[in-house]
């Protein structure tokens, strides 16, 4: 994110295929520029997503990792149905201490998964593939590790709950960024969101 499409091309040539972007316009611009030359790039949306912007990425996005509210989820469902797609999503869990971080509490996640199980017709257009989380921005590695571990426990609880409509799809735990990804990997992350450690500081 915040890096030019040429950086994506370089990473692609090095073997990377999954790319995350956190701004809708930048994502659309990169997709339009690269889609013909690099049709196998897998685009994930990983940042705050406004409901009125979902329509711009619904036709091509491979996964929305940052579903943070029921209102946003409803709009993703609506736009996915509009374009005849099923969009893979992750539900973002709010475990960090900062109020600025967004997402569902663990109890809200449990309640939402139960609703999706009980009323699947309300959630057509999305497929639940797992959870996403951002840890607190602190130096205390023990605190960060415990936050990641708590999300992993919730992930495993949901996998064993019998409430997932497609349990075989519920495989992704996206947590960890450039500053804390080793801790996330130790706590079970399957996706890590590495930007500056590969591309340098944001432009």
Where are these regions (language model features)?
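Gly/Pro- and small hydrophobic-enriched strand-loop and loop-to-helix capping segments
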Residues: 189-203
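Conserved alpha/beta-domain cores
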Residues: 2-181, 185-187, 199
């Amino acid at each position: 994110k915040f890096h030019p499409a040429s950086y994506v091309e370089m990473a692609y040539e090095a073997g990377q295929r999954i790319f995350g972007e956190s701004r809708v316009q930048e994502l659309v611009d990169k997709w339009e520029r690269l889609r013909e030359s690099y049709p196998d790039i897998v685009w994930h949306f990983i940042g705050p997503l406004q409901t009125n912007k979902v329509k711009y990425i619904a036709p091509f996005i491979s996964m929305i990792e940052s579903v943070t509210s029921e209102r946003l989820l409803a709009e993703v469902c609506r736009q996915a149905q509009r374009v005849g797609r099923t969009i893979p999503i992750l539900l973002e869990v709010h475990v960090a201490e900062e109020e600025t971080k967004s997402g569902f509490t663990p109890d809200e996640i449990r309640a939402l998964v139960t609703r999706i199980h009980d009323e699947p017709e309300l959630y057509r257009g999305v497929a639940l593939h797992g959870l996403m989380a951002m840890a607190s921005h602190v130096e205390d590695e023990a605190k960060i590790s415990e936050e990641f571990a708590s999300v992993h426990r919730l992930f495993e609880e949901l996998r064993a709950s019998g409430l997932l409509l497609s349990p075989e799809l519920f495989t992704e735990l996206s947590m960890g960024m450039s500053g804390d990804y080793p801790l996330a990997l130790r706590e079970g992350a399957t996706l890590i969101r590495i930007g500056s450690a590969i591309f340098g500081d944001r432009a």
